[in-house]
Amino acid sequence: MKFTQTEKKQLMIYVIIAYGITYVLGLLMWYGYGKGLDLSAFPNAQMLYPAAGVMMAYLITRKGDKNLPKAFYIFFVALTAVLVVCTAASVLAPKNIDLMGTPFSQWMLILQYVMIGGSVIFWILLLVSGKEKRRAYG
């Protein structure tokens, strides 16, 4: 199977985002594990990396495509970046709060609120993008 230049570029962008960010934050995870910190924020952010990699690849390589739901893709990549920052902060500046007698990571709480708000905005952006764009890019 022979790949075009665009496909090679898309694959490289995907690999850098989906696996590169995972590797770099894995080092933070290792550090946090050694310190006994709460690492529950990591999987919440990590589940978005593959989709963010695909969306970033499309944003970079298909700039002229009118069917590309750009607002949705840009917001998804931006939200993923915010979650990466929250995840890194949960290890670099850990802070626990007390919720009904149970210690809970402040960053995990912030991350959950960001994901809830982001999900609502995702639905709005997806509905506003129109049927044609949704059909073209799933």
State where each predicted segment sits.
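Specific transmembrane helices
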Residues: K8-G138
